[in-house]
C-alpha cells in the first residue's frame, strides 16, 4: 500500500463532518470498544504495521468509507469546509499527524480513486497526487453489491460508535475533579456553537459529546427526508438506538447529567416559594419601618408591624406555603415563573394561609420569549436577587442567582412606593416586595416590573476572564421615536429584498422572523400592560446599555443601536460575526472570529469589580482547542539563558486573543491589542478603561454639598443634566450599579468607584410627588473636583468612605447585606437556567494570603539567635543553625536542636532585568496605544512568570507554614515548633535539625537492605499523611528527605522497638513543602508548573490531565531506584533509562524489588494507585524478601553505563 495512504487518517466523510465544526480530531483518539477502532488507532496500526491488515478488513473499511461518503454528501458543503481549512497545517508535536487541509486533500484523492475504481464504466487512468489503491477491483465491487443492506447497518455502527471516543461522565468527574461544582451545559448563549469559548475542559468534552448526538439526529432527519420508504426510516431509527453506546437522544443526555449531579434545573416552585419567604419578610419589615418614619400619623404602626411579622412564610417539607401577605396584589416570578399572591386587606387572617398556594399562577417563559414580548422596559426597572438551589442528595448546597418579578397594581394611587387597602388611608405600610420606580402621578396607572440584581461578593482576584451571557437583552430601552424609525427601516429593507416576512416585530435581534408568539406572550400581554417613558435624545446601546444622544445604528443591519465601544467600525457584533467588512460581502469569516467576553476588573479600593464587555479574536476554533489541550514546548530541548523570556516548560497558554478597541481619534478605525499573557491583559484593560473614561464621562453641573445635619423633612435633590451618561449607564449583567468614575494619571492607573453594593433606582415613599433619592459623590483627582449625582433607591447601601458624602432621601436606604445570600467567590452566573460557572481554575492566585496563624506558634525574631552565615540555601530561603532561643518553651533545648529557615528574595540578574524591561514595555505600549500611534516597533514576548515570581514572599511563607501546621500530627514530617513574622526582613520558621543529614548526603552509606526498605516505608507513611491532607508534594527527592537519630515515638510498638534495636532509632522525615500544592489546584493550568526537579518527575507532569498523587509516586520510585542502585540519571523523565537498567543491570537486586520499582516508574495508567498499595508491598518485601540478603555492594558499577548517569560519568 502506498506511503501516501499510510500517512493520513482513514475516514474522509467523518473527518469532514468533524472539521465542519472545527473540532480537534485528537479528542477522538481513545476507543473503549475493542471491536471498533478509532481513526487514530487505525492510522497508527497502518503507520507502524503493528497489526498487518488483511484484504478483507481493507475491503470492509473502504466499503464503509464509500457508504458514509454517500450518506453525508448532501449535508456537508465540501467547498466551504476546505476553504475554512485552507492553510491550516499540523501543529502537533508528533509529526506523523498531518494538518486538516492535508488530510482532506489526501482523502479527496483517495475517494476519487475509489470512485473510479468502483465504477464499471470508467476504464481510463488519470494522473493523481497518489497512486491508485492496489487491491482487487472485482472483490470491491462484489462487496458493495452483496452487502448493500449490511453496509448501511455497519455505517451507523461506525457513526454511533463515535460516542465511545469521548470520556464518560464518571471519567470526567474523576479526571477533572468536578465534584458537583460545575454545571456543564449553557443553552442561553445566542451565538453559534463554533463561536462559544469554553473555559472548562470538562465542559469541552461534554460539548463534543453533545455535538455528536445532535449531528447524528440531524443526519437521520436528512435521510428521512430523502427516503420515501417508511419502514426504512424505522429501521434507521432502530439502528441508531441499538448501536448508540451511551445515549439515544438529547433528552437522555440531559437526564444522564442530572443523574450524575452535573446538571440541575430547579423547579419553579421550590425556588420561588422558599426564597420569596425570606426576602419578602425582611423587605416587608424594612419597608414598614421606612414608611412609618415618613407618616405623620402613627396610630396604626403597631398593627402594621404585627401584620408584617405575620407575613413571614415557611416552606415545609410538604411544599406548603404558610404566609399572611398584606398586599393588594403581588406577582413574583423567577427565571421561569410568575407568582401571584392576592389578599384583600391588611387584616387577612390565618385561615387563608393554607389556600395561598392555590393562588399561584406559573407562566413558563425563556429569555428569548421575554425579550420578544413586545415590551420595552426602562433599565431602572430591572434588578436581580440572590437565591440558592435546594440541598442535593450529597448535602452540598449550590448557590445561584434567580430572576423573579413583582407587579404592583396601583391604579388609583399617585404614590408608586406604597400600596393602600383604602384610598383614603395613607398610613398603611407597603407589602410589595420592592417599590416601583415611577417619576410622576401618572406613573401609578402603569404596573411596573422590577428585577433585583446582586453580583457575587468579594471577588478577590484583580483580573478575571469569564464567559458570561448577555442578559442585558432582557432590559431593552427604546423610545417611541426609535421604535417608529426601526419599523420604517425594517419595512424598507424587507421591501428591497422582496422579503415577505412579518414586519410587526419590533425587537432588535436577527432571528425576529423565527419567533412565534406563544401562550406566555398572550398571557403576559393581557396581564402586564405597561410601558416606559424616556428622553428621546437619550438612545441606548443594545449591548452595554449606555444611553446618550450619540448612539448610532449599525452600518450594516441598520437595526441595532450601538455605541463606539461596543462596535467595530460602526458595525454591531452579530453583523461583524457574519460579514466581511473589508470587502462588504456577506461571507463567512473562516479564518478568524471574535468572541464577546466580559472582563471583571478589580481596581484599587473597590470592593466590587467592574464588568466590561470586550471582543476577543482567535484565529480559529481549532487553534484555540490546541492551545487548551496541547503542550507547545518540547520538554527535552535545551534552553539557553537568553531564551528564558520566551520559554515556559509546563505552562499551557490560555491567552491567544486580540482585544479590539475603537480609535479615540478616528471612530471609523479600530486598534487590536494582542493578549498573550497577564501583563498584556492588564495593559489592554487599562486602555479599555481609558477609552471609556475619555469618551463617556461628561462634566456635570456643580452640585451643592449635602446638608451637614439631617433635616426633619425630605428635601428635593438638585437637578442633574439629563445628558449625564453615568446616571443612566446600565451595567452589564442587567445590574443597576450606578457609577462615579474618576481618573488618576499620576500613576497611570484608572479607578472605578461605585457604591459598596448594587443600587436599585427606586422612588421615595412619601405622600407628595415621589422624588428620586440621591447620593452625592465627590472625588479629588489632581486637585480637580468632580461631583456626581447618581440615582439611589430603596435597595442602596450607604457608603461611608472619606471622600464620599451620602445623602439619603426619605431614609429609604437600608442595608441589603442581610437579605442577600452570599455567592461563592469567583463565580459567574448565567440567566436563562441558573448555571454556576466556577472560574477559580482560570485565575492565578496571586492575592496575599489571609491564613490565620495561632499566636501561640509565634515568637519574636529577637529571641532567636542564629549563626551569621547560613549552612544551606535554596529556593526562597536560607537555612541557619540556631544557637539559642530565648523563649520559655524552647529555652532548655540544647544547641544544634533547631534550624531557622529564613525566607529571602532571591532574584538573579536575569529576573531583575526582566522586571525592568517588562515595566518599561508596559508603560511604553500603554502610552503608545493611548496616543493612537503604531506599536509595531515594540515587540516583546513576556515569559509566563512563575508562581513564585507572582506571589509575594509573605504569601509563600504563610502558605508553607499552614501546610506544615496541618501535618504536625505525623511522625514522618519535619516538626515546626514555632515561627517568627514580626520582622519582615527576618521572617521564617523554626524547624527541628536533622542530625544525620539527608538521604542524598548519606546515599552510599546506607547499604543494608533492611535499613533501605525501612526508610522507604517511612517515606511512604509520610506521603500517606500528606495526601490525606489533600496536599501534593511535587518535589519528592533524596535532598528533601532528612534522617533523624534517637527517634522516640509517642506510640509504643514492636516496630519502634525494632527501630531502636537494629537501626539506632534512625527515621526519615519529609521536608520542604514550599513546592507543594492543594490537590484541587493540580488540574489548574496556572499551577501545573514552577516546582519540580526534572530528574524526578514523569513525562505527564505539567499537563492538564496529570494525576498529582501519581506524580509523587513516580518521584518516590526515582528515589527508591537511586537508593538501591546508587545511580542518578540527570535526564528529563528518565523512565526508559530506569526500565533498561532494571532489566539488564544490577543483578544483586531481587526480582520482587525490581518489579515494584518498575510499577512505580511505569506509565500513568499502569502505575501504582496510592502509597497505601506501595506500603503494603514494602511490608511484604521487608518480611519475606529481605531476610538473609547480603548488603548492597559498596560501589555498584553499571555494565551498561549511560551518558546521563552521574556515577557513570563522574567527570561531568
Swiss-Prot record:
This is Probable serine/threonine-protein kinase DDB_G0284491. It comes from Dictyostelium discoideum. GO terms for cellular component: membrane. It comes from the Eukaryota. The chain crosses the membrane at residues 197-217, 673-693. Glycans are attached at residues 229, 299, 309, 328, 335, 341, 344, 391, 419, 422, 426-427, 435, 499. Pfam families: Pkinase. Residues 508-517 have a biased composition (Acidic residues). Signal peptide: none annotated. Its EC number is 2.7.11.1.
Amino acid at each position: 500500500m502506498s506511503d501516501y495512504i499510510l500517512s493520513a487518517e482513514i475516514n474522509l466523510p467523518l473527518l469532514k463532518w468533524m472539521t465542519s465544526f472545527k473540532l480537534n480530531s485528537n479528542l477522538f483518539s481513545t476507543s473503549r470498544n475493542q471491536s471498533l477502532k478509532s481513526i487514530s488507532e487505525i492510522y497508527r496500526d497502518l503507520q507502524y504495521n503493528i497489526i498487518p491488515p488483511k484484504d478483507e478488513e481493507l475491503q470492509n473499511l473502504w466499503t464503509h468509507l464509500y457508504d458514509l461518503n454517500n450518506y453525508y454528501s448532501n449535508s456537508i458543503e465540501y467547498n466551504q469546509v476546505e476553504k475554512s481549512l485552507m492553510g491550516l497545517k499540523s501543529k502537533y508535536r508528533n509529526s506523523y499527524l498531518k494538518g486538516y487541509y492535508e488530510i482532506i486533500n489526501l482523502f479527496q484523492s483517495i475517494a476519487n480513486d475509489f470512485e473510479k475504481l468502483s465504477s464499471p464504466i470508467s476504464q481510463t487512468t488519470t494522473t493523481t497526487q497518489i497512486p491508485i489503491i492496489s487491491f482487487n477491483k472485482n472483490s470491491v465491487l462484489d462487496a458493495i453489491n452483496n452487502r448493500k443492506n449490511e453496509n448501511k447497518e455497519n455505517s451507523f455502527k461506525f457513526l454511533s460508535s463515535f460516542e465511545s471516543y469521548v470520556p464518560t461522565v464518571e471519567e470526567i468527574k474523576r479526571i477533572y475533579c468536578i465534584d458537583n461544582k460545575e454545571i456543564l451545559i449553557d443553552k442561553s448563549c445566542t451565538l453559534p456553537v463554533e463561536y462559544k469559548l469554553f473555559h472548562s475542559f470538562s465542559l469541552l468534552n461534554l460539548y463534543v459529546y453533545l455535538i455528536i448526538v445532535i449531528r447524528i439526529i440531524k443526519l437521520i432527519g436528512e435521510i428521512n427526508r430523502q427516503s420515501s420508504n417508511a419502514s426504512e426510516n424505522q429501521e434507521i431509527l432502530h439502528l441508531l438506538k441499538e448501536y448508540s453506546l451511551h445515549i439515544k437522544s438529547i433528552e437522555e443526555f440531559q437526564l444522564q447529567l442530572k443523574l450524575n449531579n452535573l446538571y440541575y434545573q430547579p423547579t419553579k416552585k421550590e425556588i420561588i416559594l422558599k426564597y420569596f419567604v425570606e426576602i419578602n419578610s425582611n423587605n416587608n419589615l424594612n419597608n414598614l419601618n421606612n414608611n412609618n418614619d415618613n407618616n405623620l400619623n402613627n396610630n396604626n404602626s403597631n398593627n402594621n408591624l404585627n401584620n408584617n411579622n405575620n407575613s413571614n412564610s415557611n416552606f415545609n417539607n410538604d411544599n406548603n406555603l404558610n404566609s399572611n401577605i398584606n398586599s393588594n396584589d403581588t406577582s413574583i416570578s423567577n427565571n421561569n415563573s410568575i407568582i401571584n399572591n392576592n389578599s384583600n386587606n391588611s387584616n387577612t387572617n390565618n385561615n387563608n394561609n393554607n389556600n395561598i398556594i392555590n393562588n399561584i399562577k406559573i407562566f413558563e417563559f425563556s429569555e428569548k420569549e421575554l425579550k420578544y414580548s413586545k415590551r420595552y422596559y426602562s433599565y431602572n426597572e430591572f434588578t436581580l436577587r440572590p437565591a440558592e438551589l435546594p440541598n442535593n442528595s450529597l448535602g452540598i448546597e449550590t448557590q445561584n442567582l434567580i430572576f423573579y418579578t413583582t407587579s404592583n397594581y396601583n391604579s388609583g394611587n399617585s404614590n408608586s412606593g406604597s400600596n393602600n387597602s383604602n384610598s383614603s388611608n395613607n398610613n398603611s405600610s407597603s407589602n410589595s416586595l420592592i417599590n416601583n420606580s415611577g417619576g410622576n402621578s401618572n406613573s401609578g396607572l402603569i404596573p411596573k416590573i422590577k428585577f433585583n440584581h446582586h453580583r457575587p461578593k468579594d471577588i478577590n482576584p484583580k483580573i478575571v476572564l469569564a464567559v458570561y451571557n448577555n442578559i442585558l437583552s432582557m432590559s431593552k430601552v427604546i423610545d417611541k421615536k426609535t421604535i417608529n424609525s426601526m419599523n420604517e427601516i425594517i419595512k424598507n429593507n424587507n421591501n428591497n429584498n422582496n422579503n415577505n416576512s412579518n414586519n410587526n416585530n419590533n425587537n432588535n435581534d436577527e432571528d425576529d422572523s423565527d419567533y412565534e408568539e406563544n401562550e406566555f406572550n398572550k398571557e403576559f400581554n393581557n396581564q402586564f400592560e405597561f410601558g416606559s417613558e424616556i428622553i428621546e435624545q437619550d438612545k441606548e446601546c443594545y449591548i452595554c446599555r449606555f444611553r446618550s444622544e450619540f448612539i448610532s445604528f449599525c452600518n450594516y443591519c441598520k437595526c441595532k443601536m450601538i455605541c463606539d465601544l461596543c462596535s467595530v467600525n460602526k458595525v454591531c457584533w452579530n453583523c461583524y460575526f457574519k460579514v466581511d467588512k473589508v470587502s462588504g460581502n456577506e461571507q463567512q469569516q473562516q479564518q478568524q472570529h471574535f468572541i464577546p467576553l466580559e472582563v471583571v476588573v478589580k481596581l484599587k479600593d473597590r470592593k466590587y469589580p467592574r464588568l466590561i464587555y470586550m471582543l476577543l479574536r482567535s484565529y480559529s476554533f481549532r487553534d484555540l482547542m490546541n492551545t487548551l489541550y496541547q503542550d507547545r514546548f518540547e520538554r527535552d530541548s535545551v534552553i539557553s539563558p537568553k531564551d528564558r523570556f520566551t520559554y515556559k516548560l509546563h505552562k499551557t497558554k490560555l491567552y491567544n486573543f486580540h482585544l479590539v478597541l475603537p480609535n479615540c481619534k478616528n471612530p471609523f478605525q479600530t486598534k487590536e491589542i494582542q493578549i498573550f499573557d497577564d501583563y498584556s491583559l492588564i495593559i489592554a484593560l487599562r486602555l479599555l478603561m481609558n477609552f471609556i473614561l475619555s469618551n463617556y464621562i461628561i462634566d456635570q453641573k456643580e452640585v451643592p454639598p449635602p446638608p451637614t445635619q439631617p433635616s426633619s423633612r425630605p428635601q428635593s435633590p438638585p437637578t442633574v443634566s439629563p445628558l449625564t451618561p453615568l446616571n443612566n449607564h446600565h451595567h452589564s449583567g442587567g445590574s443597576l450599579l450606578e457609577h462615579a468614575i474618576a481618573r488618576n494619571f499620576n500613576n497611570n492607573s484608572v479607578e472605578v468607584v461605585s457604591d459598596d453594593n448594587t443600587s436599585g433606582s427606586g422612588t421615595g415613599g412619601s405622600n407628595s410627588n415621589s422624588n428620586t433619592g440621591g447620593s452625592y459623590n465627590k472625588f479629588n483627582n489632581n486637585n480637580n473636583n468632580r461631583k456626581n449625582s447618581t440615582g439611589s433607591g430603596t435597595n442602596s447601601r450607604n457608603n461611608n468612605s472619606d471622600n464620599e458624602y451620602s445623602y439619603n432621601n426619605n431614609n429609604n436606604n437600608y442595608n441589603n447585606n442581610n437579605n442577600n445570600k452570599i455567592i461563592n467567590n469567583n463565580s459567574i452566573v448565567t440567566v436563562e437556567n441558573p448555571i454556576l460557572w466556577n472560574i477559580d481554575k482560570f485565575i492565578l492566585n496571586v492575592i496575599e494570603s489571609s491564613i490565620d496563624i495561632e499566636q501561640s506558634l509565634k515568637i519574636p525574631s529577637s529571641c532567636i539567635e542564629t549563626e551569621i552565615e547560613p549552612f544551606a540555601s535554596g529556593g526562597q530561603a536560607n537555612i541557619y543553625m540556631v544557637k539559642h532561643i530565648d523563649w520559655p518553651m524552647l529555652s532548655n533545648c540544647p544547641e544544634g536542636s533547631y534550624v531557622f529557615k529564613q525566607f529571602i528574595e532571591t532574584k538573579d540578574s536575569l529576573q531583575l532585568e526582566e522586571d525592568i524591561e517588562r515595566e518599561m514595555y508596559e508603560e511604553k505600549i500603554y502610552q503608545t496605544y493611548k496616543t493612537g500611534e503604531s506599536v509595531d516597533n515594540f515587540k516583546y514576548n513576556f515569559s509566563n512568570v512563575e508562581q513564585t515570581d507572582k506571589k509575594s514572599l509573605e504569601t509563600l511563607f504563610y502558605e508553607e507554614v499552614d501546610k506544615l501546621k496541618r501535618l504536625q500530627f505525623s511522625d514522618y514530617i519535619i516538626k515546626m515548633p514555632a515561627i517568627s513574622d514580626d520582622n519582615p526582613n527576618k521572617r521564617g520558621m523554626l524547624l527541628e535539625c536533622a542530625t544525620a543529614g539527608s538521604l542524598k548526603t548519606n546515599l552510599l552509606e546506607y547499604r543494608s537492605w533492611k535499613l533501605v526498605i525501612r526508610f522507604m516505608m517511612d517515606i511512604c507513611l509520610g506521603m500517606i499523611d500528606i495526601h490525606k491532607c489533600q496536599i501534593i508534594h511535587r518535589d519528592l527527592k533524596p535532598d528533601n528527605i532528612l534522617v533523624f537519630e534517637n527517634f522516640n515515638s509517642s506510640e509504643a510498638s514492636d516496630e519502634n522497638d525494632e527501630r531502636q534495636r537494629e537501626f539506632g532509632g534512625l527515621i526519615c522525615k519529609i521536608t520542604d513543602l514550599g513546592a507543594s500544592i492543594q490537590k484541587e489546584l493540580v488540574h489548574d493550568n496556572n499551577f501545573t508548573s514552577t516546582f519540580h526537579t526534572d530528574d524526578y518527575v514523569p513525562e505527564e507532569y505539567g499537563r492538564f490531565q496529570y494525576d498529582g498523587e501519581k506524580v509523587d509516586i513516580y518521584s518516590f520510585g526515582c528515589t527508591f531506584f537511586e537508593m538501591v542502585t546508587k545511580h542518578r540519571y540527570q535526564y528529563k523523565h528518565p523512565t526508559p533509562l530506569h526500565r533498561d537498567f532494571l532489566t539488564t543491570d544490577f543483578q544483586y537486586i531481587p526480582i520482587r524489588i525490581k518489579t515494584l520499582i518498575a510499577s512505580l516508574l511505569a506509565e500513568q495508567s499502569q502505575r501504582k494507585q496510592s502509597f497505601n498499595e506501595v506500603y503494603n508491598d514494602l511490608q511484604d518485601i521487608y518480611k519475606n524478601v529481605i531476610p538473609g540478603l547480603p548488603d548492597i555492594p559498596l560501589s555498584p558499577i553499571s555494565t551498561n553505563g549511560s551518558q546521563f548517569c552521574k556515577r557513570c560519568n563522574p567527570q561531568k
